[in-house]
Amino acid sequence: MALPILLDCDPGHDDAIAIVLALASPELDVKAITSSAGNQTPEKTLRNVLRMLTLLNRTDIPVAGGAVKPLMRELIIADNVHGESGLDGPALPEPTFAPQNCTAVELMAKTLRESAEPVTIVSTGPQTNVALLLNSHPELHSKIARIVIMGGAMGLGNWTPAAEFNIYVDPEAAEIVFQSGIPVVMAGLDVTHKAQIHIEDTERFRAIGNPVSTIVAELLDFFLEYHKDEKWGFVGAPLHDPCTIAWLLKPELFTTVERWVGVETQGKYTQGMTVVDYYYLTDNKPNATVMVDVDRQGFVDLLADRLKFYA
């Protein structure tokens, strides 16, 4: 039986590819998709969800827009990474359907309430919508199987020296998620920076030759340009968000550890840092499964295999 999931995202090139991977995988049943502000403004990320589902011919999936700003802060966006539209590069179709007439939290709550079994929440943007759901619907916590997030790092940040972008945008929300008592799986930069797509991988995807694989290749063409900056030391572009979906499909591709994770909300230099108690230096019990390594070639092979679904 397919695993029911609820996807909360802020497309974003890598979010878009995570959607492609999820909807090409019969092991997963995508119940709804909600959008958050982050990689671009809330209006643009919502539109990008609708554009991707129009491309994939999955306008049957309910969509709702989420919070327009973080819980306690002003919004920061990553337009320098994802371009003016949030999905610069390919020519994507205009949406042929509208979002639901409700908020992201209302759609999430409805989805959980109506599901016969607990739902896995996959959150690949800031954690604002998920935190609002947890705070406003404590009665639904038992309907959440786990929360799989792309965010954080045990080491270096990518937005500040200490913080990864998604967590930095709304650290208070991320702290609510990590301390919720619900199982959390963290795909942080430690693993996503190893999930790099090289130029030859992009050409492999392009050669599959269907409209979706071509769009994915064009998304990666744009994404690779930003990551060519020598400061990163990358060979290709790190495909952050699809690691969450890939872990659900093939956990054997990933090395994980069970650790306690907290989020720094106050530090002068460290706001948004995920503090991982790797060496068990506190009495805090582990609250997260933390990804630390990935079989890069296996990850690329999985993407290539699933892109053939769209032939």
UniProtKB/Swiss-Prot annotation:
Gene Ontology CC: cytosol
Residues at the catalytic site: 240
Gene3D superfamilies given in the database record: Ribonucleoside hydrolase-like (3.90.245.10)
MF term (GO), any: purine nucleosidase activity
EC number: 3.2.-.-
Keywords of this entry: Glycosidase, Hydrolase
Pfam assignment, any one: IU_nuc_hydro
A GO BP annotation: nucleobase-containing small molecule interconversion
Entry function: Hydrolyzes cytidine or uridine to ribose and cytosine or uracil, respectively.
Family recorded in the similarity comment: Belongs to the IUNH family. RihA subfamily.
Protein name: Pyrimidine-specific ribonucleoside hydrolase RihA
Protein species of origin: Shigella boydii serotype 4 (strain Sb227)
Recorded name of the encoding gene: rihA
